[in-house]
Design a protein with these regions (language model features):
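Anion (oxyanion) recognition and catalysis
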Residues: 58, 306, 324
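Generic structural signal for residues in well-ordered beta-strands
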Residues: 64, 265-267, 330
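Conserved short alpha-helical segments that host acidic/polar catalytic motifs at enzyme active sites
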Residues: 1-193, 205-236
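Anionic-ligand anchoring segments at beta-strand to alpha-helix junctions in alpha/beta enzyme folds, i.e.
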Residues: 121-122, 132-134, 204-221, 229-286, ...
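Residue-level detector of conserved catalytic or cofactor/ligand-binding positions
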Residues: 334-342
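Acidic-glycine-rich active-site phosphate/pyrophosphate-binding loop
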Residues: 323-332
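Surface-exposed amphipathic alpha-helices with a cationic face
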Residues: 299-306
Length: 342
């Protein structure tokens, strides 16, 4: 609604974003437009070469109203627009550096929404009443339990008739939806003032829910490791890599691993791990921890570990997330229950 009035229409995009470029202001707020408002964009991420692109556009006569990198995307789409949204989007993707999840509207195609993903999470929810895009699953659970996870450099076109997926080469893709069977309370505050307080009070239950299904006949059985007893005993070092509160969990885990298993453990902030050129000897296990499975620095750390040829284990909540797909093995926390792809 706007000032208490219901807005007409069945297509729309919006985004609340940290002010990474420019001060918080109406001019810098999303969505952003080209000059005649025929192209509209919302953006989660950072365009690293936006100043170079902005300089080029200004030399072509484009004027900017905001200080954001997102407005550059709107004008880039305008510059390359030839009447074909998909071709225009891929041209712009080839010229942008950085991470982005985009929602795009074209006035010429009023019943379509285009969404793009590169190194920033993006999911598509689908139901009989409509289709939605969001950065994470909890945002759509109120409306649907069936979601698609976009891979890197994939594009989706949402229409009244359904969903169409493409890669950056404009080739149409077949994708499977995943049915999310979560306890809705896990995605709500549950009466707490904020999520941090809720998570603190839920820790005992979360630990119990995670461990109970993996204790059988007095033994701890973690089948998700995908390792034989001999391979587990051969591990000589463990790295735990994470960001935010997941990092603090890693620090606590270090004490437990070293006390019980007598294996040396290093805990790294993912943003540091990927740049410090870590020494990863043979028989090392790198444990990647991320609630969403999409944390950019953590995902980059996973890819670095795989490049160096060491075994990786992802610990995440979200099935189908990038870390879940790319790690050698994945362990889902039992606090949330997720079904397999349908």
């Amino acid at each position: 609604t706007q000032n208490g009035a219901t807005l007409p229409g069945t297509v729309g995009i919006g985004h609340t974003r940290w002010a990474t470029h420019g001060a918080p202001s109406d001019l810098n707020a999303h969505p952003h437009f080209n000059k005649d408002h025929s192209i509209v964009v919302v953006h989660n991420g950072i365009i690293e070469n936006y100043l170079k692109l902005k300089k080029k556009l200004m030399s072509k006569g484009y004027e900017f109203l905001s200080e954001t990198d997102t407005e550059v995307i709107a004008h880039m789409l305008d510059y390359y627009y030839n009447g074909d949204p998909l071709a225009t989007i891929t041209k712009v993707m080839h010229r942008m550096e950085g991470s982005y999840a985009l929602g795009i509207l074209f006035r010429d195609y009023p019943d379509e929404v285009y969404a793009v993903r590169k190194d920033s999470p993006l999911i598509v929810g689908t139901s009989k009443s409509g289709n939605l895009i969001a950065s994470d699953v909890p945002a759509v659970l109120k409306y649907t339990r069936d979601v698609y996870f976009l891979e890197n450099e994939e594009i989706v076109k949402l229409t009244r008739d359904g969903l169409h997926f493409y890669n950056i080469d404009e080739e149409e893709l077949e994708k499977e939806a995943t049915h999310i069977d979560w306890d809705m309370n896990a995605a709500e505050k549950g009466g707490y003032e904020h999520f941090m307080l809720k998570e603190m009070h839920e820790q005992p239950k979360a630990v119990k829910d995670t461990l109970t299904p993996r204790i059988k006949n007095g033994d701890v059985v973690i089948e998700e490791l995908g390792m034989t007893d001999e391979e587990i005993r051969a591990i000589r070092k463990i790295f735990i890599v994470a960001c935010g509160s997941a990092y603090h969990t890693g620090v606590t885990s270090k004490y437990i691993f070293e006390k019980l298993a007598r294996i040396p453990v290093e805990v790294d902030l993912a943003s540091e791990f990927r740049y410090r050129d870590p020494i990863l000897p043979e028989n090392t296990l790198v444990v990647i921890v991320s609630q969403s499975g999409e944390t950019a620095d953590t995902l980059a750390a996973l890819r670095l570990a795989k490049e160096k040829g060491v075994r990786t284990l992802g610990i995440v909540n979200v099935v189908g997330s990038s870390i879940a797909r790319e790690a050698d093995n994945v362990m889902y926390l039992s606090l949330i229950h997720i079904s397999e792809p349908t």
